[in-house]
Design a protein with these regions (language model features):
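Active-site rim loops that border cofactor/substrate pockets in soluble metabolic enzymes
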Residues: 30-33, 122-126, 130, 141, ...
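Conserved PLP-enzyme active-site core in the AAT-like
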Residues: 1-108, 142-143
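Structural signature of PLP-dependent enzymes
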Residues: 109-141
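Catalytic-core signal marking the mid-to-C-terminal active-site face
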Residues: 139-167
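Short, flexible, solvent-exposed loop/turn segments with mixed acidic/basic and small polar residues
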Residues: 59-61, 112-115, 159-167
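Short glycine/threonine-rich loop-to-helix capping motif typified by GTGT followed
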Residues: 37-40, 129-134, 162-167
Length: 167
């Protein structure tokens, strides 16, 4: 059920170029780094999508990047000018504070790649042992009467970040 096949972006780009139709790739979360070595299942990095040639790329400035809640549009100047000419643009453009915050988070990638300066990624990549210690610390603060009453325990599990951050 659901989606059973996916058309490669490169094929969609070829059709778009052939018929002069702009191709938009909506990444959802967006990340600048491959997160495989941190055991974080994520989509392709934005740079890999750029190489595939869509005219417009959309992704989140917050979810995986760790910046302020925002949407990022990567496109040619021509496409950006078309987008900016839409009257809705004024209502959805970022303010100066959001732009300054995005600049800081993007600079952290440029300077450090993956680092503890990026809270979102450092929390997602936190080792399981660290999470167990935190869980035990919190658990130890719960009165034993409540633990017994509600049948509370610390259990191993595997979950993924929500809100569409990860595929």
């Amino acid at each position: 059920k659901g989606y059973t096949k996916e058309v490669p972006l490169e094929d969609i780009v070829k059709v778009g170029k052939k018929y002069n139709i702009p191709v938009l790739a909506d990444l959802g979360s967006g990340t600048f780094l491959s997160l495989d070595k941190y055991n974080i299942p994520a989509e392709l990095p934005v740079g890999d999508i750029v190489k595939k040639g869509p005219d417009i790329i959309l992704f989140s400035g917050d979810k995986m990047l760790g910046g302020p809640q925002s949407g990022i549009i990567l496109a040619s100047k021509k496409m950006i000018d078309i987008i900016k000419s839409n009257s809705i643009y004024r209502t959805v453009r970022c303010d100066k504070i959001t732009i300054a915050m995005l600049d800081q988070i993007i600079s952290s990638y440029r300077k450090n790649g993956f680092s503890n300066l990026n809270l979102s990624l450092s929390l997602l990549a936190r080792p399981r042992e660290d999470l167990k210690k935190i869980a035990k610390s919190i658990f130890n603060e719960v009165p034993s009467k409540k633990i017994n009453m509600f049948g509370l325990s610390i259990e191993e599990s595997f979950v993924e970040a929500g809100s569409g951050s990860l595929p």
